[in-house]
């Protein structure tokens, strides 16, 4: 793990990661994911403002309870992580107001939880996490998760779902239309939206080139 990637909060990172149970072998939600989300969050916070310490803690704890994508508990993952975040920060003697702020940001970051972010830090974290799901990293993560779940790359009989329902549990490429392209239009901050436009273009370019090869 590269603590310099968590600058300027390396000491806090060390304290928080001591409570992180790991990603249970999920390379799409490992410490490199935390590093990328923090890179995104720091870039957005530099333009939009907000409490950087709260944002950092929320970033490191946003996936602290691991739930597989195909689990029936998936929609509860951010709520479970928020509960654990409260316990962790309480053990570190954080003030209640900051604990509440971190917990809300953690709970609201998730696409599947459908919790509306009401604070700037929560909006920044949601944007930062969603940025890691689109663009070329998003492409890599999509196919990585599909491989773990045993999904096919695409439906050879109808790769573009012209005459069938989209099904991203069976076909990896369907996930672009069921989620990833939708993610790119729902950003909370001006800075996040600008970053998302660039990455959405990369997603679309990948889809176009993929379609040309099958």
List where the protein language model places each region.
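Divalent metal-dependent phosphate-bond-processing catalytic cores, especially two-metal-ion Mg2+/Mn2+ enzymes
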Residues: 2-5, 22-49, 61, 114-214
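Short alpha-helical hairpin
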Residues: 2-19
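An active-site-proximal "capping" alpha-helix that borders the catalytic cofactor pocket
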Residues: 37, 76-91
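A short glycine/serine-rich beta->alpha loop
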Residues: 24-26, 70-73
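Hydrophobic, well-structured mid-protein blocks that either form specific transmembrane helices
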Residues: 85-123
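His-Asp-centered metal-binding catalytic motifs of divalent-metal-dependent phosphohydrolases/nucleases
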Residues: 52-71, 77, 81, 101-111
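N-terminal glycine-rich anion-binding loops that anchor highly charged ligand groups
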Residues: 8-11, 29, 53-56
